[in-house]
Amino acid sequence: ASDVYKRQEQWQGFCGSSFWKDPVRTAGQLRLYLDADFLLQDPSAAEKILRSLTEKEIQSVIALPKILRLRDGQYLEKLRKLLLENLAYINGFQAANMEHIALLKQWNFTGKEIYGDHSLYLWNRTSRDFWKAFLDGYCLPLELNAAEQRDILDPAFPAEKVIYGRIPMMVTANCVQKTTDRCQPQENPKALDLIDRYHKRFPVQRNCTHCFNVIYNSVPLSLHKELCKWSGLVTGRLDFTTENETETLEVLEYFAGTRKELPYGEYTTGHEKRGVE
């Protein structure tokens, strides 16, 4: 989900982390997914960010907006121009749906990798084999349990696994703000929460650039106790959504091994054990 102001804070948190300050231990092994909206907000700053990542041997992968419409033509042309100007510093793109695959094929950025997000639903070996023709890697589906995820692993098709981050419960073209009140597109949208009958708060991120919402789980997914079971099988992925600069830094330091105390209280292990039917 795009929230350029949160992304700016998260970028600052990353720049203060061990992953940035001590790049030698992760040289060539670290991949950073950068939100396209965040980069397009300030093209000159985007160039500096992409160049600095290349200098530190950190892979830059551009994450496209979750929902795109025909009216986004002008936005896409601006984005394509920005990407072309900085193509030397970009390693690839993240595709969250089939429309992204078609768009990237149309743009034809030769030599750039495409990584599928978990929303592409590679639920079994058949779908995995289908996507091999279009992707250079993929993210394991959040809905499958650990055993089911292992069943679709293929050494010839690199997989990543989300080990931290708020799980998106829904990506919707309907806006919570507009439905409950009125449309209020603004430069810095106020945070919204949905509250259930148990008084749990579910953060809502509004993307006013493309007019969609992402509703996140009330607590983050955290598989810090499961990491040893996946060592050597997948690449671990940290997803930052509602975190500010300090929270981002604390989570990064914990998973970097430089912080001993878990920086958050409540968390969920998602479908790691039970899966879905």
Model-predicted segments: where are they?
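Active-site pocket-lining/capping segments in soluble small-molecule metabolic enzymes
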Residues: 2-277
